[in-house]
């Protein structure tokens, strides 16, 4: 399957069959938070300072059933949110989800990422989680999104990593082989996949990895289908990831989980090796981490930015003393009178 239109149609069919993510619809705001979806927290992470405005425009690119969209609306009370997706079925769920939780500052569009230029204006925050790696041409997709990012704006991206999903790729191919001409029948694919897991020995590597890492979420057919019978998936390594980033023309700000990219937990027992690693570039150190700890790197989650994007320097005492502190909205999941809970 190489024709882009055929691929896009197959992806839309999957999500029309199994709307994803399958989180339940609530008649109230969603619980907790994801700080990456909170403008104040995300901007502070990227720049080291609070943004000057909160009345921003947000694009949820590939919104699925609206789980991320709903959070983006509720976590950013002054923002206007636009959400797009290629699947009409998931958009219907997303619309109902936001209506039921009173997330009313959102507009939905049945649109491919490739066609983001059809949207009016620019956006201060673009969120695209789990979407680019399902496009026939992810570089074209990220370029389309980059054209909609306003100067000084930030983009939050999540894509799959190759090394940590090795067993998944094997199972995907096994299911496709056994489906034969029925490949593309996603309900049959889920049934075949579950039968394979049930038939394999308990000590089988694919079974063990599924049980250790994925089985809880994969109890739901929607999650199982998204993982094992998806018609289009491109997984990345550090090298190919930065090729994707370069195609965007945007600045790489950093991974949103920076502690996961530290070498100390891996090589801390040997200071000499850590010293050798200091001579490596950032990208080489990232590559070293995923080579030494491949099971932990199942995806990459990071921020990109468009200049001019300020970077606060708090090394000067005078600057620090002149700063006006403000509580991070994602310090706790609820309002609290205390700064730290012990």
Regions found by a protein language model. Give the residues of each.
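Conserved alpha-helix/loop element of class I SAM-dependent methyltransferases that forms part
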Residues: 17, 27-56, 71
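Conserved SAM-binding loop of SAM-dependent methyltransferases across substrates and taxa
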Residues: 65-77
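Conserved SAM/SAH-binding beta-strand->alpha-helix loop
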Residues: 87
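Conserved SAM-binding strand-loop segment of SAM-dependent methyltransferases
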Residues: 102-114
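A short acidic, Gly/Pro-enriched loop at the edge of an enzyme's catalytic core
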Residues: 117-125
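A short glycine-rich, Lys/Arg-flanked "PGG" loop and its adjoining helix->strand segment in the class I
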Residues: 140-151
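Conserved class I S-adenosyl-L-methionine
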Residues: 154-206
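Rossmann-like AdoMet/SAM-dependent catalytic core
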Residues: 212-342
